[in-house]
Amino acid sequence: MPHSDELDAGNVLAVENLNIAFMQDQQKIAAVRNLSFSLQRGETLAIVGESGSGKSVTALALMRLLEQAGGLVQCDKMLLRRRSRDVIELSEQSATQMRHVRGADMAMIFQEPMTSLNPVFTVGEQIAESIRLHQNASREEAMVEAKRMLDQVRIPEAQTILSRYPHQLSGGMRQRVMIAMALSCRPAVLIADEPTTALDVTIQAQILQLIKVLQKEMSMGVIFITHDMGVVAEIADRVLVMYQGEAVETGTVEQIFHAPQHPYTRALLAAVPQLGAMKGLDYPRRFPLISLEHPAKQAPPIEQKTVVDGEPVLRVRNLVTRFSLRSGLLNRVTREVHAVEKVSFDLWPGETLSLVGESGSGKSTTGRALLRLVESQGGEIIFNGQRIDTLSPGKLQALRRDIQFIFQDPYASLDPRQTIGDSIIEPLRVHGLLPGKDAVARVAWLLERVGLLPEHAWRYPHEFSGGQRQRICIARALALNPKVIIADEAVSALDVSIRGQIINLLLDLQRDFGIAYLFISHDMAVVERISHRVAVMYLGQIVEIGPRRAVFENPQHPYTRKLLAAVPVAEPSRQRPQRVLLSDDLPSNIHLRGEEVAAVSLQCVGPGHYVAQPQSEYAFMRR
């Protein structure tokens, strides 16, 4: 049945009165109510709101992916203009017809790349499959196009990455693969669900620029789901604000940022962390929290005397971590990924040291190496005077009670067969800390501390949004009252209100219990807010380390300055330069086996502030 006359000529998508519900305990729970919007050709519509507001389920409903998950979808109209210019009603399409629509006419970049990529196929096979299916290309042509798309999203050694499996890539790399796959068939509508959440600011800038370029080339409509208001200001033409499943405000990006009408929109904007807000301050400051009655009151500075003088709780010296790459007919190790190269730092009780850098710079590997989740090839890791790198498995398990890890991908770190209450209570049982009733009470307290309800303990991970799952992982890490928490992108998946709550919670726990944090993040505004010291990593080495105020207010290394320059600003009138200061050819940290890389030499430029001496081998130093 033709629908061309029902869709305005300039529109590629129109939705009227979308309602989404789920059945729980034989009750219908509404997730989205009476949502209507349209999308013009070449336009970017940003959908923003808190975690659980209905943003992602709206996208899944458009892709017709909710029915198989038990979602109840009702809609008066859900029209799509395909690449062929034919207009179809999405709700009328069969499962077979939708397989031809997805990817070709409407593509989606999902929030959690590890669960969206098939672990048993290489990256190249997965991108090429979509190209072969929708473009009738041969296998060879599809692989050539797959390599070109990886180059487009700035993945170094793209030819090598084609033959890698998803688990062999960092979180940021996996997200770039997802973006390459979604853009490979040049769809009429691209739905991007938090596409840059896992990316550092420099790659984020390139991806946003890439989406803009392809959007202009193809007159592609983009629905951009995000909680990052800086990204919204940079990429959006119109903004739709959602709150508790309803659209509370919509307008142009200038109207939303300069004249917000709804109290929630005003509170959302007021809670956005601004880079430079900590200028002149030495200690971390609590985030303002969203309140509809009192939009984002400014919190007073923390009385921050948490750093304990004396011996560091964690001492790392010349840490080296490498991964072998095999090739050839005999499958021999011929090359190595130099993930971490001679990294050294100290962490004091009550201190927050942030590790920042691009995806693939070695941040996450450094954190994992500290707990021996990956084995290192050299260096020393000393916790409270005890060598971690030489401990037996039994002693290492006991030590992990004092050092906890918050992982980057919350869905992959929760057992889908266990309720979240069981997941949180498990470390208490393993270490024999609390009897049954006390452990259950502890779980309820932890859930409340991270902004969830005690009754959520009986639910399973798939019943929560991405942001809610990350809060569950944080509650689990806090269960044992550890001395050190390694937080790997712990708040990157959270919206600004929950992010503020979690950061404030971490600061409260640091003040009350003297917890030390190794905070791994690409969100420079959050890093500025929470850190005592900052270490900048590039190609597996620390190129600048020092007090947060010194690094942010007086960055000495060119790479540090480029990281700060790439941060999006939550102000539509203050656009970044069209070309963010990045080199055209990304250097690689893959080297021939036995080849040694010269370690950088750090030079003192101020109290506790050290910077790598200029060396010609850094690509970014040559520009």
From Swiss-Prot:
EC number: 7.4.2.10
PROSITE patterns associated with the record: ABC_TRANSPORTER_1, ABC_TRANSPORTER_2
Enzyme class: translocase
A single GO BP: transmembrane transport
Protein name: Glutathione import ATP-binding protein GsiA
Cellular component terms per the entry's GO annotation: plasma membrane
Membrane topology category: Peripheral membrane protein
GO molecular function, one term: ATP binding
Family, as annotated: Belongs to the ABC transporter superfamily. Glutathione importer (TC 3.A.1.5.11) family.
Subunit structure: The complex is composed of two ATP-binding proteins (GsiA), two transmembrane proteins (GsiC and GsiD) and a solute-binding protein (GsiB).
Subcellular location: Cell inner membrane
Keywords: ATP-binding, Cell inner membrane, Cell membrane, Hydrolase, Membrane, Nucleotide-binding, Repeat, Translocase, Transport
Sequence ranges assigned to domain ABC transporter in this UniProt record: 15-269, 314-564
Main function: Part of the ABC transporter complex GsiABCD involved in glutathione import. Responsible for energy coupling to the transport system.
Lineage: Bacteria, Pseudomonadati, Pseudomonadota, Gammaproteobacteria, Enterobacterales
Catalytic activity: glutathione(out) + ATP + H2O = glutathione(in) + ADP + phosphate + H(+)
Residues reported in the UniProt entry to bind ATP: 49-56, 357-364
